[in-house]
């Protein structure tokens, strides 16, 4: 072996070198440590301990939500979280459903990314505070109610379930656009309500009320 420095260390050295160059375009870009190890808790913990030594600005848990049971994902988060620096943001990659987000916050995760709001919307699957719905279902043919009676997004204020059902059946592009708008609004509202409940010390109540409910299909 020509060098004892592993790829993990080289990444930080190279990142620091590039940021030190006078013509670097954006010195605000950050290098984060991404925890891996599949569903093996011992490998996950070992890896988290190693990347924590690099003193990076943030840490992520990667390689989950790729087909393993949800409970296994939660077990991995619980195993890794104690070894993540307490003063750095924790990022769970590629997650997830509204229930996944609530349960992961309860386990110490700070933020997320996921295509689910947009991807599901394109297939007529929309999120509401009562659970998820599929607007292609025949029962919405003459449903004049909004997507979600509790939602105040522009779509819910102006359009009915029946109208969006018609748009999907007619294969109109507008159906997907309106549905994506609603789902993104829902996710923004969800995360805002989570933050508010954490600030007021009521997250436990919020979790008890919505974690299971939002996982249901109605």
Where do the language-model regions lie?
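Surface-exposed helix-capping loop/turn segments at secondary-structure junctions
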Residues: 15-27, 88, 194-206
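Acidic/glycine-rich phosphate/pyrophosphate-binding loops and surrounding catalytic core
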Residues: 11-18, 46
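Glycine-rich phosphate/ribose-binding loops and adjacent secondary-structure elements
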Residues: 21, 26-147
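Short, small-residue-biased leader/transition segments that mark boundaries at the very start
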Residues: 1-7
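Residue-level signal for well-ordered alpha-helical scaffold segments within enzymatic catalytic domains
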Residues: 13, 54, 79-82, 166, ...
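C-terminal extensions of enzymes
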Residues: 148-218
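Secreted/extracellular small peptides and ectodomain modules produced from precursors
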Residues: 4, 112, 151-154
């Amino acid at each position: 072996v020509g060098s004892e420095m592993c790829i993990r260390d080289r990444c930080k050295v190279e990142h620091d070198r590039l940021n030190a160059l006078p013509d670097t375009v954006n010195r605000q870009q950050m290098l984060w440590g991404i925890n891996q190890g599949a569903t093996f808790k011992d490998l996950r913990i070992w890896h988290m301990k190693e990347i924590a030594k690099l003193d990076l600005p943030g840490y992520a848990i990667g390689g989950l939500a790729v087909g393993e049971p949800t409970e296994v994902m939660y077990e991995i988060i619980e195993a890794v979280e104690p070894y993540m620096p307490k003063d750095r943001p924790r990022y769970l990659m590629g997650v997830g459903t509204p229930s996944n987000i609530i349960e992961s916050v309860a386990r110490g995760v700070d933020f997320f990314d996921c295509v689910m709001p947009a991807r599901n919307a394109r297939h007529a699957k929309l999120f509401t505070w009562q659970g998820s719905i599929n607007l292609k279902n025949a029962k919405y043919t003459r449903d004049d109610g909004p997507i979600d009676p509790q939602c105040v997004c522009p779509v819910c204020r102006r359009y009915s379930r029946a109208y969006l059902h018609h748009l999907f059946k007619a294969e109109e592009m507008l159906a997907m656009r309106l549905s994506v708008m609603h789902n993104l609004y829902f996710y923004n509202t969800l995360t805002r309500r989570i933050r508010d409940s954490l600030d007021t010390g009521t997250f436990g109540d919020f979790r008890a009320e919505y974690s299971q409910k939002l996982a249901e299909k109605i």
